[in-house]
Amino acid sequence: FGKMSVGSHTTDYNSLVVLTHFKGHTQGGFGGSNKNIGIGCADGRIGKAWIHTTPGQDNQWDIREEEFMERMTESTKAVIDYFGKQITYVNVMRNMSVSCDCEGVNAAPVVTPNVGILSSTDMLALDQACVDLVYAMTEAEHHDLVERIESRHGLRQLSYMKELGMGNDRFILIDLDNGGKRITAAEAVEALNELAESRN
């Protein structure tokens, strides 16, 4: 997109805090900050239709997976370009179903362990870190969510953000619960598993 139709009050503000429940998503594979902004800030009548619908088609849901990822990401880029450096992202990795919150009571049950809260001023780094944490879990823990991500081509969100220069896909995890210690995704998941075992 060269432009995006957003909610009418979006431009009333000069800064933005993006608070996102990280989880799976029916079309996006996963819903992180990119999905939250790209879909959440697009206005309902025009912007969301641009993202979901192939030009000339009446069916709102006919778009191919990767094209959907790219349109959603371009919608996000319009918003973050507007706010510039005055934007911060927070992803909450708790109660992660393969389904979006918008599905309500029809959402699939939660089967992925709670991880915690991640935050960054770099959206790509944040969404990449969340995905990496999911992949670092055991097969039993992440199977359903990874299957949802891969079957919907969800990783295209990350590669397209990088292509558009929307952040850095390399990151450092800093554990604030342990004095700001640097940890890997695998270490973060190990600590999570140890905590879960200690509660049993």
Where are these regions (language model features)?
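Extended, low-polarity segments enriched in aliphatic/aromatic residues
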Residues: 1-200
